[in-house]
From Swiss-Prot:
One of its GO terms (biological process) is ribosome biogenesis. NCBIfam families: Obg_CgtA, PRK12297.1, PRK12299.1. This is GTPase Obg. ATP binds at residues 166-173, 191-195, 213-216, 280-283, 309-311. The keyword ATP-binding applies. Keywords: ATP-binding, Cytoplasm, GTP-binding, Hydrolase, Magnesium, Metal-binding, Nucleotide-binding. An essential GTPase which binds GTP, GDP and possibly (p)ppGpp with moderate affinity, with high nucleotide exchange rates and a fairly low GTP hydrolysis rate. Plays a role in control of the cell cycle, stress response, ribosome biogenesis and in those bacteria that undergo differentiation, in morphogenesis control. Pfam families: GTP1_OBG, MMR_HSR1. Its EC number is 3.6.5.-. It comes from Prochlorococcus marinus (strain NATL1A).
Length: 329
């Protein structure tokens, strides 16, 4: 499935129906009064969060979304039918902005949550509305109001409590695959993961916690280099970051510093987000090398650093215990 996490759409609410000018015409009522009905309300355009959707792909080619117009009024003071609302399903985690002003209209995070993004126009008045003591036979009526029309930007930010970050080939996809039932593409070269992978990891209580493997973080990612700028937004909602370091890389210390710099540059409070530091690929180093590297990383972080092997599953139970503790479970 192609992963689309941004889309621009045009929405147009329905216009209100026109009121009409009509008079009561009955056999024994020679001076029937005004009886023109009001127009119906235009339909709204509504977005609704749906947890069965994972991408904004449906909006890639669906550019204009409109709602029904209200119907014109009828005789005998009959109000025209209101236009039907158009309800669009979007993934949970979709943020909606006005394209021209960048103002956030809403953030659809919960299943079934709705947001009206374009209001339908009000129906016009029929001439029955203008009856007065001074005018017993008004002919005046009004047209319906035009429905709202906007260009919107939809931006999907994944709803995961734990975000797994690190340079390409640090072992993020392998880790999420052994902790959960997720089956991401895994290979021994950088940029295997081109879309965020989600996996549900079971807590001791049996409840699930969503983990996200965030791809594409390289030096300059926060400035749009590589894939990182597109995916950094997906860790904005996370509660805990799992910072994975490839202990067998050419320069693990520099790798650690690179990710730190990108989190700082991107902003949005990511650098101050609770973080658990993890040295992965223990199986590729001897005990002396691991201990030496561990000491260096702990001096930089001033925190405990976990040593794991996602391949052999060494240290995963201890790592999970730390994650549950940080999340308050």
């Amino acid at each position: 499935m192609q992963f689309i996490d941004q889309a621009i759409i045009d929405v147009k609410a329905g216009s209100g129906g026109d009121g009409i000018s009509a008079f009561r015409r009955e056999k024994y009522v020679p001076a029937g009064g005004p009886a023109g009905g009001d127009g119906g309300q235009g339909g709204n355009v509504v977005l609704e969060a749906d947890d069965n959707l994972q991408t904004l792909l449906d909006f890639k080619f669906q550019k204009l979304i409109s709602a029904e117009n209200g119907q014109r009024g009828g005789p005998n003071k009959c109000t025209g039918a209101s236009g039907k609302d158009t309800v669009l399903k979007v993934p949970c985690g979709t943020e909606v902005r006005h394209l021209s002003t960048n103002i956030i209209l809403g953030d659809l995070t919960n299943k079934g949550q709705q947001l009206i993004v374009a209001f339908g126009g009000k129906g016009g008045f029929g001439n029955a509305r203008y009856l007065s003591n001074s005018n017993r036979a008004p002919e005046k009526f009004t047209e319906g109001k035009v429905g709202e029309e906007w260009s919107l930007q939809l931006e999907l930010k994944l709803l995961a409590e734990v975000g797994i970050i690190g340079l390409p080939n640090a072992g993020k996809s392998t880790l999420i695959s052994v902790l959960s039932s997720a089956r991401p593409k895994i290979a021994d070269y950088p940029f295997t993961t081109l879309i965020p992978n989600l996996g549900v990891v079971r807590r001791p209580s049996g409840d699930g916690t969503v983990f996200a493997d965030i791809p594409g973080l390289i030096s300059g990612a926060s400035k749009g280099i590589g894939l990182g700028h597109d995916f950094l937004r997906h860790i904005e909602r996370t509660k805990v970051l799992l910072h994975l370091i490839d202990s067998a890389s050419t320069d693990p210390i520099n790798d650690f510093k690179t990710i730190n710099e990108e989190l700082t540059s991107y902003g949005h409070g990511l650098i101050s987000r609770p973080r658990i530091f993890v040295l992965n690929k223990k199986e590729l180093l001897n005990e002396h090398e691991i201990k030496k590297l561990l000491n260096k990383i702990e001096k930089l972080t001033m925190k405990k650093v976990h040593i794991i092997s996602a391949v052999t599953k060494f240290g995963l139970d201890d790592l999970l215990s730390s994650i549950w503790y940080e999340l308050g479970y």
